[in-house]
Amino acid sequence: MTVDSKPQLQRLAADVDVDLMCRLLEEDGAFILKDLLPLDVVESFNRELDVQMAIPPPKGERLLADKYPPHFKYVPNVATTCPTFRNNILINPVIHAICEGYFQRTGDYWLSAAFLREIESGMPAQPFHRDDATHPLMHHQPLEAPPISLSVIFPLTEFTEENGATEVILGSHRWMEVGTPERDQAVLATMDPGDVLVVRQRVVHAGGGNRTTTGDPRRVVLAYFNSCQLTPFETYRTMPRETVESMTVLGQRMLGWRTMKPSDPNIVGINIIDDKRLENVLQLKATDLPA
């Protein structure tokens, strides 16, 4: 089979039936949603990220950013610093329809992390990997176990072959190990701003190398949704309460400010306090609840 004849990533309209989306995650392991985010939302998000990029890095240890090469810029915690993310993108109904189907065997889910990566010219391609480094438990799950993590990739600039569009190996979620795949086994997730790449747990993928010599860096926000049975990689418990109360109930749930319910046999939930729901003890307000 030649490279051109390989099965490619399915590109779906955002209003396609969610059952088809979930079926593609089980069959192919990934798909692209076209034009999920309106361009005005993308532009607003980019402006907020520009502000964060301009802030000098804090002094002292940075657990992740200090490990990255100079061609690679990183901004963590966009849920706290970017209103467009937490009040729009984080509560997108299509993303949550996918998550509800995807996590139906394990119960509620929440955001594990969301951060910006900006990849400049000269950045080499990543090694092929699975998104399981933050929670090694995932590496030990049997193939038949229900998925407990979902990666959602938001391109905020154009993704091309030249600037390092994500490389995805379809069907690799059924592999026992990552091994040492050849790059021609992968397909390219070329995308425009507003598109979204949805990737099932265990799928082998990599960021491509940025071979461009002119133009802007490739900008992407990576969001990871996990079963509420996994502790999030980023904690949002330090967000100001007034910021949290400017959000919807769904947004608050995603950021760990409400009690969550795993699947049975758990009958009371997790993230509880004094045997009560967290939100009730806090008397937490939300924009979509009566005053």
Swiss-Prot record:
This is Verruculogen synthase. Its EC number is 1.14.11.38. It comes from Neosartorya fischeri (strain ATCC 1020 / DSM 3700 / CBS 544.65 / FGSC A1164 / JCM 1740 / NRRL 181 / WB 181). Homodimer. Keywords: Alkaloid metabolism, Dioxygenase, Iron, Oxidoreductase, Virulence. GO terms for biological process: alkaloid metabolic process; biosynthetic process. InterPro entries: Phytyl_CoA_dOase-like. One of its GO terms (molecular function) is dioxygenase activity. Belongs to the PhyH family.
